[in-house]
Structure formats: structure tokens, C-alpha cells
Amino acid sequence: MHTANINKFIGMTLDELHNAEVKHPKFCDDFTGAREWFIVDELERWRKVNSRAPYHADAILNEEILEALEAYKQGDLEHCLQELSQCGAVIFRMMEFVENEMEA
């Protein structure tokens, strides 16, 4: 991914963050309401989906989000942040995918 695209996407994201903070000053009451068994079951399902072609961006993002939730539920907050960073990376790649379609 080109640095110009990364900077553009970061700028777009920061604009949306500002808008969200203005619109919803109170973000949330807790990190997740999902039960641990649900996270484990869904994570296993998405890992199977993502283990074979065709690969879909939304499926990859679902797996990354569930990995972040799992780490949070296990109390591994550093790992949770790493997984959330991976979610961000997937979202940037999704943004680039859409932009490439717009240019085609």
C-alpha cells in the first residue's frame, strides 16, 4: 500500500473519529456483551471459512474482530490491542480495494 493512500485513509478515519466523538460523546458502557462460548464458536467458524479460497475481506475482518474479543475476554489486553491494530490494517486494505474499484 502506498504511503499516500495510508495517509489519506488515516485522515478520513480521523475525520470520522472526530464526528463520532461529537455525535456520541459517550462511546460505550463496556467492551463486549458477547458470551465467551459465542466468541469461541464464531472464531472457529470464521477460521474455517478463511482457511480456503475464495477469500473475502469481510470474513477476514470478522475473524480479526473475534480474535480481539477473545483476547479481551481472556484478560490479555496487550494482545487485544494487537488484534485491534490488525482490524485497522484489514480495514485500510478494504479501503484500498474499494478505491481501486473506483479507479477501474
Locate the predicted segments by residue.
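Flexible "arm" and connector segments at domain edges
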Residues: 1-104
